[in-house]
Amino acid sequence: MDISKRIAFIASQTDGRIVADIGCDHGYTACLAVLNGKAEKSYACDVAQGPLNHAKATIQACHLEDRVFPVLSNGLENVPDDTEQIVIAGMGGQLICTILSAFPAKTAQADSLILSPHKDPELVRQWLEENGWVIEQEYVIEDGNFYPLIRAVKGQMALEPWQQYYGLHVHPDEQAAAYLKDQKRRWTIIHNKTPEDKRKKASLRLQWIDQAALALGMEA
């Protein structure tokens, strides 16, 4: 399997006895979770037959036909009821929220969620806050771009604005520091190019980046 750093890390963070990977593409995450001993069984789920056929080929190549099962499913619609952990990665934050909201009973049956949006992570954190989930741990994955990985369990939390945009309980490592430095650079450019009377958004972002860095004991 030609595994990206991002997919390998996501799979390494699974720890549910039975894991469902939503939008499975080639089925790498579902297979790695089992191969690495992180899950006893997994479901590789996708809305389209094409990606599911790729997943079936991966499952067969790994000789995991008795432990990894392809499931044709529109989001969570057909995810089996014994699923304990839901993984959704490789899509935008808005789509992740839509998937989690579409079949609330399916979402509620899971004990934990592993979510890795490639954009708009603040929407995912807001959804978790509003729907009875608490962020247990976050990581930053650097693989060409920066990708947050959010692990959530059931519970209540109240996020500050900087936490909604830059994470809660973020693991303080080089990737997290590099992400905040990159954000600081980007928003400084935007701030400096924006007319003074329209800088509020950029100024807030820069303030939140500094708060996030302070929480990690880092300097952005």
Predicted regions and their residues:
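Conserved alpha-helix/loop element of class I SAM-dependent methyltransferases that forms part
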Residues: 1-17
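Class I S-adenosyl-L-methionine
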Residues: 2-3, 94-220
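Conserved class I S-adenosyl-L-methionine
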Residues: 16-25
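Glycine-rich SAM-binding Motif I of class I
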Residues: 27, 31
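Conserved SAM-binding motif I beta-strand of class I
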Residues: 41-46
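Conserved Rossmann-like nucleotide-cofactor binding loop
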Residues: 50
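S-adenosyl-L-methionine
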Residues: 53-81
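Short SAM/SAH-binding signature in class I
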Residues: 83-90
